Amino acid sequence: MNERIFRENTRPVQVGNLTIGGSEELTIQSMTTTKTHDVEATVAEIHRLEEVGCQIVRVACPDERAANALSAIKKRIHIPLVADIHFDYRLALKAIDAGVDKIRINPGNIGRRDRVEKVVNAAKAKNIPIRIGVNAGSLEKKIIQKYGYPTAEGMVESALAHIKILEDLDFYDIIVSLKASDVNLAIEAYDKASRAFNYPLHLGITESGTQFAGGIKSAAGLGAILSLGIGNTLRVSLSADPVEEIKVAREVLKSFGLSSNAAMLISCPTCGRIEIDLIRIANEVENYIATIKAPIKVAVLGCAVNGPGEAREADIGIAGSNGEGLLFRHGKIIRKVPEAIMVEELKKEIDILAEEYFEKKTDLESLR
């Protein structure tokens, strides 16, 4: 078997102002739930996604009304826009003309070679990449006939066939996904793909389910794949508000130390020793840091047994006991505060840390 190609060794592909592949960086994506032709609703949903950390957004493009709306949508958002195209090559051409940053197609279902060539040439002329989206539930008939059912080998074979179509047309700005609702199948498919080609991989567990069950299923599957050192972008697919997809994706990346722009909460599971309202405090702090785009580790702990030690491991933290708490910053006690103002005092310190991070980041960027 070939050696696994890790994420930092994949081929860099430019998607709008983002570079996908060629580094340790992972990018979070989502997809709108609105009718794309409804520009106002689609833009409003994308703005909500931007606020919680979505970095690339995909919209369905099933007809001309949707294709005709892409330009107006693109002008009003701040992250790269991807058009999802199936079957009709003319919609892909319209999307490219509208200025989208990437198109998602399967070259095999666009039609004859001359149609694929038109799409590829148009994308090449505008430096727009193409994502090949292989899905276990819609593999080509010949693949199913060969293997009997969806397999990781069949999914990779399908991806390679589609890749060859593009490479034969001298097109290499390619990103590939191999999604399945079966977690084990998805893990195996992505592992095999990472050994078969060096194009960036977009990760996902498709049709994973509702917010609760789907979030757990996605975290299990994506976590296993990420732990292999592969994957360059990801989407958590949920039957829920897409904002929830971003929240789960951010937590998955934070768990693996792969998010450079998100705050992380550490809080204890509670027990009979707790003497403060820790669950309420932890939830309030979690909501507060949800939109902070700085790599700050925040601890909320509820007793004197593990609290002080755990809090010292965080950038900022509080260890509560007997209706009051000790505020820690980088391992040192700042002050003691009563429970009534504990959260507000912690928020102030979080804001100070975030501001320091942004100032340092600005200074470093000015030196480049």
From Swiss-Prot:
<dbReference type="GO" id="GO:0046429">
    <property type="term" value="F:4-hydroxy-3-methylbut-2-en-1-yl diphosphate synthase activity (ferredoxin)"/>
</dbReference>
<keyword id="KW-0479">Metal-binding</keyword>
<protein>
    <recommendedName>
        <fullName>4-hydroxy-3-methylbut-2-en-1-yl diphosphate synthase (flavodoxin)</fullName>
        <ecNumber>1.17.7.3</ecNumber>
    </recommendedName>
</protein>
<feature type="binding site">
    <location>
        <position position="268"/>
    </location>
    <ligand>
        <name>[4Fe-4S] cluster</name>
    </ligand>
</feature>
<feature type="binding site">
    <location>
        <position position="271"/>
    </location>
    <ligand>
        <name>[4Fe-4S] cluster</name>
    </ligand>
</feature>
<comment type="similarity">
    <text>Belongs to the IspG family.</text>
</comment>
<feature type="binding site">
    <location>
        <position position="310"/>
    </location>
    <ligand>
        <name>[4Fe-4S] cluster</name>
    </ligand>
</feature>
<dbReference type="GO" id="GO:0016114">
    <property type="term" value="P:terpenoid biosynthetic process"/>
</dbReference>
<keyword id="KW-0004">4Fe-4S</keyword>
<keyword id="KW-0414">Isoprene biosynthesis</keyword>
<dbReference type="Pfam" id="PF04551">
    <property type="entry name" value="GcpE"/>
</dbReference>
<keyword id="KW-0560">Oxidoreductase</keyword>
<dbReference type="GO" id="GO:0051539">
    <property type="term" value="F:4 iron, 4 sulfur cluster binding"/>
</dbReference>
<dbReference type="GO" id="GO:0141197">
    <property type="term" value="F:4-hydroxy-3-methylbut-2-enyl-diphosphate synthase activity (flavodoxin)"/>
</dbReference>
<keyword id="KW-0411">Iron-sulfur</keyword>
<dbReference type="GO" id="GO:0005506">
    <property type="term" value="F:iron ion binding"/>
</dbReference>
<dbReference type="InterPro" id="IPR011005">
    <property type="entry name" value="Dihydropteroate_synth-like_sf"/>
</dbReference>
<comment type="pathway">
    <text>Isoprenoid biosynthesis; isopentenyl diphosphate biosynthesis via DXP pathway; isopentenyl diphosphate from 1-deoxy-D-xylulose 5-phosphate: step 5/6.</text>
</comment>
<dbReference type="InterPro" id="IPR016425">
    <property type="entry name" value="IspG_bac"/>
</dbReference>
<feature type="binding site">
    <location>
        <position position="303"/>
    </location>
    <ligand>
        <name>[4Fe-4S] cluster</name>
    </ligand>
</feature>
<dbReference type="GO" id="GO:0019288">
    <property type="term" value="P:isopentenyl diphosphate biosynthetic process, methylerythritol 4-phosphate pathway"/>
</dbReference>
<dbReference type="InterPro" id="IPR004588">
    <property type="entry name" value="IspG_bac-typ"/>
</dbReference>
<comment type="function">
    <text>Converts 2C-methyl-D-erythritol 2,4-cyclodiphosphate (ME-2,4cPP) into 1-hydroxy-2-methyl-2-(E)-butenyl 4-diphosphate.</text>
</comment>
<keyword id="KW-0408">Iron</keyword>
<dbReference type="InterPro" id="IPR045854">
    <property type="entry name" value="NO2/SO3_Rdtase_4Fe4S_sf"/>
</dbReference>
